[in-house]
C-alpha cells in the first residue's frame, strides 16, 4: 500500500465536488525516462494506483514513454516490476514506447526523471516549462545504473504524492 490516505481523500473530495456540479475535467499526465522500462512506467503505475485508491481513477489519463528508441516494445524491467509488486502495484501489459509530438499536444503535464531526459525532450518537443517539468527538484535515481530499485520507488512515490497534492 502506498498510504497517505489524507491526500487521496482530499483529491477525491475536490473531484467529487466538480463532478456533482458537472465541472468534469480529466488530468492527462505522461511520465518520461530514457527507455520506458524502469522509472517512467513506475511513475505511470504508481500514480494510477494512487488515483484508484482515491476513487478518482476515471478522472486521470496516465501514461509513460521514453526519449530513446532503445527499448521500444519491451516490458517493464523485471527488478522494477518486482519492486512495484512488493507494494501491490501491477504493471502488466506495459510495452515501452517513445514520446511523440502527439503526446505533447495530448497531455497536460509531462514529467521527466532527470536532466538527461530534459535535454532529449528539448530537442524533440517545444520548450514549455508549464507543461514539461521534472518529477522532483533533483534527478530521480536511475536503477539501471544504481541497481537500487527501492530508492527509485521512494523517489517516484514522493513525486507522485506531489502530483496528488497539486491536483487536490
Map each language-model feature to its residues.
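N-terminal amphipathic/basic-hydrophobic helices that include classical n-h-c signal peptides
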Residues: 1-25
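Generic secretory/membrane-interface signal
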Residues: 3, 10-14, 30, 38, ...
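Conserved phosphate-coordination/catalytic loops
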Residues: 5, 93, 150, 154
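Surface-exposed beta-strand edges and their flanking turn/coil or helix-capping segments
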Residues: 8, 44, 77, 106, ...
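Conserved active-site segments centered on acidic
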Residues: 19, 25-105, 165-168
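Phosphate-binding/catalytic loops
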Residues: 103, 109, 113-168
Amino acid at each position: 500500500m502506498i498510504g497517505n490516505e489524507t491526500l487521496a481523500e482530499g483529491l477525491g473530495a475536490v473531484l467529487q465536488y466538480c463532478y456533482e456540479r458537472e465541472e468534469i475535467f480529466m488530468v492527462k499526465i505522461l511520465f518520461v525516462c530514457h527507455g520506458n522500462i524502469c522509472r517512467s512506467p513506475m511513475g505511470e503505475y504508481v500514480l494510477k494506483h494512487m488515483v484508484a485508491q482515491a476513487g478518482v481513477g476515471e478522472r486521470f489519463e496516465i501514461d509513460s514513454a521514453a526519449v530513446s528508441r532503445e527499448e521500444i516494445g519491451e516490458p517493464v524491467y523485471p527488478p522494477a516490476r518486482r519492486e512495484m509488486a512488493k507494494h501491490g502495484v501491477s504493471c502488466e501489459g506495459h510495452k515501452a514506447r517513445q514520446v511523440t509530438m502527439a503526446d505533447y499536444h495530448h497531455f497536460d503535464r509531462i514529467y521527466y526523471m532527470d536532466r538527461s531526459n530534459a535535454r532529449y525532450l528539448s530537442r524533440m518537443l517545444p520548450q514549455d516549462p508549464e507543461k514539461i517539468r521534472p518529477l522532483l527538484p533533483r534527478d530521480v535515481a536511475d536503477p539501471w545504473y544504481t541497481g537500487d530499485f527501492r530508492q527509485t520507488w521512494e523517489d517516484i512515490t514522493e513525486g507522485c504524492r506531489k502530483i496528488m497534492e497539486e491536483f487536490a
